[in-house]
Amino acid sequence: MIINHNLMANNALRNMNVNSNNASKAMEKLSSGLRINRAGDDAAGLAISEKMRGQINGLNQASSNAQDSISLIQTAEGALNETHSILQRMRTLAVQSSNDTNTTTDRSAIQDEVNQLTDEIDRIANTTEFNTQKLLDGSKVGLVDAKDADASVQLNTSANISLASNFSTTSATGIADSFTVTITRTHGTAGATFASTDYDVALVGGTELIEHSSSSLTYDTKAINLVGMIKCFSIRTNDTIRKVSHVRTVKALSMQIGAIVTNMLIGINSMKATDIGVRNTSGKALDISTASKATGAITQINNAIETVSTQRSKLGAYQNRLEHTINNLGTSSENLTSAESRIRDVDMASEMSEYSKNNILSQTAQAMLAQANQQTQ
């Protein structure tokens, strides 16, 4: 007979505690709805689900960012819609002024309206903003101009049509074998490239000086056969091609549309009257005081309408892309949420069954403990 230990009571007590703890854990899971409430429940599962939660939160915020970006684009596009309406009105006035049935007084009145409309274009460009950020004043173009860059080319010709070069910029000097000449204009770039490696000469955008069906050029003692038309720039000796006398650094809008690092740059050109071509550099609006000037103004206004249309098309493309981005982010977030749920969320039916089992076992163990304590040792 054993008198120091009641083994049956100890066994019943141990099982009762185990079942009670299991029932308590099951109740915690049922009350929280989570299978993992602490790292001890599933250490690996907790680590995986936390990474997923971070990505899900990032995707949801990226979707919100994309929505904000669309709102910004809609703000800019709405302002440009009004700019378009103003330009259409200005074109109508220019067409009206080009008719000689109008007197000088009539054209003066028309000019006054054109002046006011031009001022309104500038006001829209200077005041349109989203969350205090200017959108149409040229501060969101995303381009950087060079600083004080002078490019000089010296062309010497002889009977053999030979070419000598002396080219320098702030970044490169003394280019002996090859060089590239670039002329930057308001709406584009025309370039001429000379290369000594294969001795091809490509000249684009210059003034036509020579035209032959075929000719021969000598460059560095090697012959170049050109068939067709030869075009080159009309450049005086040591003529300066381009000089940029200022620095203008502007920044495009960077949109964070991904959970990690996915930036989208949105550039918006200046929509000021001068930049779209309906105000000259001296600050005067288009002159429609005569029929001939009004006719010329129509062409300038047409170009301005095309410029604004191009910018609105870009904004529309940005918006369409962002809408697809939002759809993709939503799908990704939904799939990751489903995966995270399978790891972390509790199966209510299964856990309820587990709780009922452990609760019954705990009650049974408690009853058996009472019986064991009454047994003869």
From Swiss-Prot:
Origin superkingdom: Bacteria
Key word Secreted present: yes
SUPFAM superfamilies: Phase 1 flagellin (SSF64518)
Keywords: Bacterial flagellum, Secreted
GO cellular component: bacterial-type flagellum; extracellular region
GO molecular function, one term: structural molecule activity
Localization: Secreted; Bacterial flagellum
PANTHER family attached to this UniProt entry: FLAGELLIN
Function, in words: Flagellin is the subunit protein which polymerizes to form the filaments of bacterial flagella.
Family that this chain belongs to: Belongs to the bacterial flagellin family.
UniProt name for this protein: Flagellin
Gene source species: Clostridium tyrobutyricum
